[in-house]
Amino acid sequence: MIYMDNAATTLQKPEEVKEAILYALEHMGNAGRGGTEAALDASRSIYAVREKLADFFNAESPTRIAFTANSTESLNIALKGLFQPGDHVITTVLEHNSVLRPLYWCQEQGVELTILNCDEKGNLSYEEMENAVREKTKAIVCTHASNLTGNMINLKRVGQIASKKHILFVVDASQTAGVYTIDVQELEVAGLCFTRHKGMLGPQ
């Protein structure tokens, strides 16, 4: 079989992933909920993953890593938690529904939303993005790569705009985490949301 749907989920996982899942099922207890060896083993394993992810994405600290069920949940928590009525948010037409739907919900609550268009080849104008920033703009929210067209957004360029304008930069890296190098400090990303079952080669 030739499998060509890795952007939806990776099918063939490394043996180490399978072994880790089996070990967790057979040995790990409830993390943070007891003093048994099984519970402590789970807690230590979770923190070890925090450390590895912080190093992988160059986060400031392992304590900046939060685990959720998936990227959709991460984006919903981040976007619905960040914005208040009267805030202004900039996003793009390249976004997945996991970005657009919570932003539409925010819009219904009184958040102003600007959705930037792209040209016929799917490319954005970064000059237009910078010009879209207003006094009440709180964040730029964008994907790193479109799951439909494959177009990629220049995160360094967007991060520079966000830093220059003193606003937050939130990235949906569902398609690119584990595939492309992402340094959140260099790119000035305030929130990076991604899933484990695509480029990170983890379970769904």
Sequence positions of predicted segments:
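Pyridoxal 5′-phosphate
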Residues: 1-204
